Amino acid sequence: MDPAREAAYEAVAAVHRDDAYANLVLPRILRESGVSGRDAAFATELTYGTLRQTGTLDAIVAAAADRPVDRIDPPVRDALRVGAYQLLHMRVGAHAAVATTVDLVRSLVPGAAGFANAVLRRIAEADRSGWLARLAPADPVARAALTHAHPEWIVRAFVDALGSLDEAELALDADNLPPPVHLCARPGLLDPADLAAALAGAAVGRYSPYAVVLTGGGDPGAVPAVRDGRAHVQDEGSQLVAAALAGALLDARDDTWLDLCAGPGGKAGLLGAVAV
């Protein structure tokens, strides 16, 4: 078994099976499996790329398998997603992508190895553009949803908000770009400039007063300030939400605030640190 590919599969499976957060589960999997350096970078791209492209990958897997993806055993389905991403999005040879994925499926569901081999070989017969041309719906919005791996309702919402499908597709393209890793220097415990100066390939964020961006990549869990609790991983946009709320002028009313992007508590934790 290839450790990097196995780590990526485990992270993808955890997201779909357990509603796990990839940014939380993947670093733990990499550490526990001893995957580091270039192998960790490969596993990271494979994990996040597979998750970003799941909608399109599922359409291609379903066509190659001649069945809906919800009729494929979940472990096999996730392995096929990981294999298909390598075939269609990464500079990985078809033989390596197929062979390693079949080995993975054999370790998960031995009886499904032949099925996986057939599906992946069928996928490898065309590149991504070829598959999109073959599967493209007539409806422009549905076609954009397939091309950009977004649900149709999101594409329609973008069109409504931006006024045209062309503008919406630019936003969808941007939404699929791999985001940089941001750290949040916890107020009162660490200055962002000091954190950035202590790390190679790091810079103070552009917008949040607490942000540091890891421009050189790497495992944020290995950062001493993250390990000792003076910083944590948090997207700069999420930090801005907390900063905006912390600076909001409140009148005498008992206002209620609704977080429509609630997760594991990053914004709430930052608000607590600001309030101390």
Outline where the language-model segments fall.
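Rossmann-like S-adenosyl-L-methionine
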Residues: 194-276
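Class I Rossmann-like S-adenosyl-L-methionine
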Residues: 1-222
